[in-house]
Structures are given as structure tokens and as C-alpha cells.
Amino acid sequence: MKRTIIMMLDSFGVGASADAASFGDVGSDTFGHIAKACAEGKADIGREGPLKLPNLARLGLGHAAMESTGAFAPGFGDNVELIGAYGHAQELSSGKDTPSGHWEMAGVPVLFEWGYFSEHQNSFPKELTDKILARAGLDGFLGNCHASGTTILEELGEEHMRSGKPIFYTSADSVFQIACHEETFGLDNLYRLCAITREELEPYNIGRVIARPFDGTGSSDFARTGNRKDYSLAPPAKTVLDKLNEAGGEVVSVGKIADIYAYCGITKKVKANGLEALFDATLAEVKSAGDNTIVFTNFVDFDSHYGHRRDVAGYAKGLEYFDARLPEMLALLGEDDLLILTADHGCDPTWQGTDHTREYVPVLAFGAGLKAGSLGRRKSFADIGQSIASHFKLEPMAYGESFL
């Protein structure tokens, strides 16, 4: 029985990539800087001491990062019995965003330029927002700027509740984000507004509209809920997910994967929120998955809760939780199963600002006859998609080289 399990540690980069200068990210290193902070006692909130990831280390994380940066991260070294194949991959795509990373690893790199709202204030064209408001029956909106999602709730959440005006904001990514209170504005109304916005954005080539629902009674206790929804463009070509689907296989999305691929190629969507629930759901789906199935999970908390919020201790604690549960996954794998752990970009919690960082991503692979050892530097995330195509004996993808 052949299956592939992809565990996407969203934003878990392993060092600045060769083209990082073009993004202002030279020196960024999500994994390395977390390990360094832990070793120096600077990440002892909710956890303490050096970063402890013994299972990821056995799969080759420390070695992959060493090959990426030229040095082992603090607390990681050669004194580990490797069980997995490891490498690090350069992104071909033009951006360092979520859709680009996901699409590329499924065999479809983004070789065009996304549209962006580059102005930090008055970010959105008036003709665009006028059309959105008219169609939605709204008389105004708040925000219209680049912002951190948590900060903008503190600044504008109470005014939003009083006025009923949605909060529009963006970032360095190709994204239009809309924050609304689940109770006072209504979740269905937010989703309808996002669907309208997605349609009106067609001429602008914006990658995603993101619904950002929140709850709470005031600025001191506003919090995002688990009902986020992404409205992505569809990939410009068939991904390996589509090809397996067309060949009669199954593709199970856990978390936000289905949204990122605009449901293309997805046969089942499983909703889960938080690291524990996402891991539980992934294990449950692997237990029930049959032959010719991909189970694909995005562990978004690493990015949304820890990377963007520059929470080093939280990121470290999340990684240690994830690592502690990996033996549960390994115990479910058959000899023909392929497990891949990777990331879609970096988001160094020690870096300036709140945006993603252009980094190499780890490629940790286990099973399917792979021998423990180095896969080297992969020229594209698409090597993952090509390897999956090879594993299932599908028609080769246009991009990528298989490491199987």
C-alpha cells in the first residue's frame, strides 16, 4: 500500500537562501535563531533550556540546516543516529508567500509576479473598495493599511464593533485581509464579504483574501478564532494533487491545505485548529487512509502564532510538542509509505518586522525505500512534487527532480 504523508511546518525555514538579498532577508534563519535563543536562555517562557528535538534530529533536521548554513545549530550535531533522508530546498517562485511555497512543492512554481498593495497607508485603490462596499451593502471600512493582525484588533476592534465597519488590511504578501467580529458582524457575513472581495480582486492578481474572524469584548481580550478561511486563486497548472486525484487516488486536506489550493485536487477536507488538534486529525486520517492516498497537513500555528508574532519561546515550545508526537506518526507507517516534513517559507521570530523571510526549507523524507543520508541542496521545492509523482507512478511533473 503506497501513501504519502506531508507534514508542513508552516514557516520553518533553515537559513537565508541564495536570493535572500532581493527580499532584505540576508542573515535570517528561523530554525538556527530559535535554537540559539534557547541555548542562551532567551526562550524560557513556558519551556526552558536548549531546544530539544530528538526525533526531528534523527530524521535529519540538524544536518539539513548544517548543509544550508554551514554550521550546526546550537544543540545539534553529528552525535545522532540518522533514520531519514535530509536536504534543503531553494524556492524558484517569485514570492515568499504561502500559495507560492505550497504550489511549488506540488510541482507548480509561481514564475509570474503577484500583485501587491505596497503603500503602507491608504493601501487599497478607492475604486476597488467602492465596488466591494457597494456589492456588500456597507457604508465604510476601517484600516486600509499594512498591519499586524493582532495589533490592528487592539487599535480598531472596538471601533469596528461600534460602527459595524469591517477592517481591511494587508502586508508585504499578496493578500487582502478582512477582520470582523464573529458575533457583532457575523461569520457568514464575513465570508460573503470575502467572496465578493475575491471576485473584485481579479484584475489585481492578488494571491489570497483571508477572512480573519475574532471574538472578545474589548481591546484587552480580542482574539482570532479558529474560523479563518482563505480565498486563494487556483494554481495555474495541474499539481501532483490533481494528478493523483485524476488517477483515482485520494487527497486528504487537514487544516488550511484545501483553501491554499482553492480545493483543486482535494477529495476530503478535515477541519482542525491548533497544533494538538491538527496532529490528532493527521494521525486519524493516516490510520484510515487506503492505497494511493496523500494526507497533507499544514501546521499553521508555527507561522501565524509564533513566526509573525515574533514569539521565539512559543515557536520553540510548539516545535518541541510536535517533535514529541512524531513517534506516533512513525508507528503508523508501512514499508511503502513516504513521510515528508517540510516548510513553505521562513518566518524568523528574531527578525525585524512581522513578515516572512526568504529561506531554504528543510526536506526530511522517511520510508519508501529511502536510505538515511543527504539529499543535498534541492534546486526547487518542486522536487517534492516530482518525488510524490514518482512514488505513485504518475505522469512526471513539468518541474522538479525526484529524490526517490
From Swiss-Prot:
Cofactor: Mn(2+)
Cofactor info, note text: Binds 2 manganese ions.
Biological or metabolic pathway of the protein: Carbohydrate degradation; 2-deoxy-D-ribose 1-phosphate degradation; D-glyceraldehyde 3-phosphate and acetaldehyde from 2-deoxy-alpha-D-ribose 1-phosphate: step 1/2
UniProt record, GO biological process: 2-deoxyribose 1-phosphate catabolic process; 5-phosphoribose 1-diphosphate biosynthetic process; metabolic compound salvage; nucleotide metabolic process
EC number: 5.4.2.7
Compartments it resides in: Cytoplasm
Catalytic reaction equation(s): 2-deoxy-alpha-D-ribose 1-phosphate = 2-deoxy-D-ribose 5-phosphate; alpha-D-ribose 1-phosphate = D-ribose 5-phosphate
Enzyme class: isomerase
Listed GO CC annotations: cytosol
Keyword field: Cytoplasm, Isomerase, Manganese, Metal-binding
Binding site for Mn(2+) 1: D10, D344, H345
Binding locations of Mn(2+) 2: D303, H308, H356
GO molecular function: magnesium ion binding; manganese ion binding; phosphopentomutase activity
Top-level lineage group: Bacteria
Principal cellular location given in the protein's record: cytoplasm
NCBIfam families registered for this protein in UniProt: deoB, PRK05362.1
Family: Belongs to the phosphopentomutase family.
PANTHER family on file: PHOSPHOPENTOMUTASE
Job of this protein: Isomerase that catalyzes the conversion of deoxy-ribose 1-phosphate (dRib-1-P) and ribose 1-phosphate (Rib-1-P) to deoxy-ribose 5-phosphate (dRib-5-P) and ribose 5-phosphate (Rib-5-P), respectively.
Descriptive protein name: Phosphopentomutase
Protein species of origin: Shewanella baltica (strain OS223)
Gene coding for it: deoB
